[in-house]
Amino acid sequence: MSQRIFLPDTLANWQWPRHLNPHYAEVKKASAAWAKSFRAFQTKAQEAFDRCDFNLLASFAYPLADEARLRSGCDLMNLFFVIDEYSDVATEEEVRAQKDIVMDAIRNTEKPRPAGEWIGGEVSRQFWDLAKKTASTQAQKRFIDTFDEYLESVVQQAADRNNSHVRGIESYLEVRRNTIGAKPSFALLEFDMQLPDEVINHPVIKELENSCIDMLCLGNDVVSYNLEQARDDDGHNIVTIAMNELRTDVAGAMIWVDEYHKQLESRFMENFKKVPRWGGPIDLQVARYCDGLGNWVRANDQWSFESERYFGKKGPEIIQRRWITLMPKMVSEELGPQIVDGSHL
């Protein structure tokens, strides 16, 4: 008999509601066409990529953005998942080379990419060439710095995978906090802001970011576990990590994740109430930024069930009943995402 899994409703009491950017449909059309133009995947994988609708994720994550900044968000989410799909099947050395290509492309957008280079370089160059036009100087710097950190952690993830290295909970979260790509995503929240370093680096703001990132990590790992175990790629997932360290099963790991998530929620809300005031217009920007962090947690969860990334067409049903069936192993020779057959869930 197939094993059933209960997905904890980690956001049952989260105060940020579902909020979709009104420019979603129009901007999605442009960004999806842009992403598809690179032909990064074969036909079937491209269809699966389209069904994932990473533009929906951006439109939940940046509900107040104007069309230009939403386009940057959509393009970034598409770029993230191009990098993700290629790095997931690459060696540490190959991922290191991919990182070098991407960072060179972002730091030198005026430089044409070499013929025959990995496609991620040109995707990155075009993304940043457009996105930086809508970003403040501080936000540009923070994006580049945090994107470099993100890519370095993806290299580390590849090293762990190649060496079959299974981390403990704390060690895993140290790496996962960067591989999830939250920090560069947060930089987009401040594209139209002028937040000084002393504000963005304030301990309370950092604590808010850290709690938000950990909730994103846990939430994403809960919904992605089934697909990742089916692809035999669940070594970099908190459910697997908790099962190994706590010597428990999937159900036990899910309970642990739910309890830890509640602690993170409390920590976030405590710090949300402690955000200091600097005076003047900066306080309005800080309030928007912190609200954006809270919204990101809801955005990631909502997209996980409304797109077809993890549950095929059954997401809206599963978000209500929470029970799913452990999927059978999936083997694909084709690079890129795979279409999820909801009949297995």
From Swiss-Prot:
Taxonomic classification: Eukaryota, Fungi, Dikarya, Basidiomycota, Agaricomycotina
Keyword flag Iron-sulfur: no
Residue ranges of the motif DDXXD motif: 84-88
Function recorded in the entry: Delta(6)-protoilludene synthase, part of the gene cluster that mediates the biosynthesis of melleolides, a range of antifungal and phytotoxic polyketide derivatives composed of an orsellinic acid (OA) moiety esterified to various sesquiterpene alcohols. The first step in melleolides biosynthesis is performed by the delta(6)-protoilludene synthase PRO1 which catalyzes the cyclization of farnesyl diphosphate to protoilludene. The orsellinic acid synthase armB produces OA by condensing acetyl-CoA with 3 malonyl-CoA units in a three-round chain elongation reaction folowed by a C2-C7 ring closure.
Catalysed reaction equations from the record: (2E,6E)-farnesyl diphosphate = Delta(6)-protoilludene + diphosphate
Record-level Gene Ontology MF annotations: magnesium ion binding; terpene synthase activity
GN (gene name): PRO1
Quaternary structure and interacting proteins, as annotated: Monomer.
Binding residue positions for Mg(2+) 1: D84
The record's free-text note on cofactor binding: Binds 3 Mg(2+) ions per subunit.
Domain note: The Asp-Asp-Xaa-Xaa-Asp/Glu (DDXXD/E) motif is important for the catalytic activity, presumably through binding to Mg(2+).
Binding-site list for Mg(2+) 2: D84
Residues annotated as binding Mg(2+) 3: N220, S224, E228
Protein name per the record: Delta(6)-protoilludene synthase
UniProtKB keywords: Lyase, Magnesium, Metal-binding, Virulence
BP terms from Gene Ontology: terpenoid biosynthetic process
Keyword Ion transport: no
Cofactor section: Mg(2+)
Record-linked Pfam families: Terpene_syn_C_2
Pathway note: Secondary metabolite biosynthesis
Binding site for (2E,6E)-farnesyl diphosphate: R309, Y310
PANTHER family assigned to the protein according to its UniProt record, in alphabetical order: BETA-PINACENE SYNTHASE-RELATED, TERPENE SYNTHASE
Outcome after substituting S343F: In strain: FU02472
Biotechnological utility: Melleolide sesquiterpene aryl esters are cytotoxic secondary products with anti-cancer potential. Armillaridin shows therapeutic and radiosensitizing effects on human esophageal cancer cells. Armillaridin induces autophagy-associated cell death in human chronic myelogenous leukemia as well as of hepatocellular carcinoma cells. Armillaridin can also inhibit the differentiation and activation of human macrophages and thus might have potential to be developed as a biological response modifier for inflammatory diseases.
